[in-house]
Amino acid sequence: MQFNGTLDELKTVVNELQIPCNWEHKGSYELAAFEDGISNLKLNWWPETGVLRLVGDPEVRNDVERRLKELLENR
């Protein structure tokens, strides 16, 4: 996935997933750790390249990734 906006814009999109998360700055990338109580999903974003990568439990990740892609396409 790709996102070329600002961190605040990305946070707004991620908030639309309605899954609580905490954001952390990790040097060259930003990380959103989702707190859904059932998975270990994390969203990594490299602002310089725009690369977005969702990692964690595939059972939950696939659905969240699909929803996130839809939100990004419709913004």
Where are these regions (language model features)?
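Conserved short beta-strand edge segments in small beta-sheet-based binding/regulatory domains
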Residues: 57, 71-75
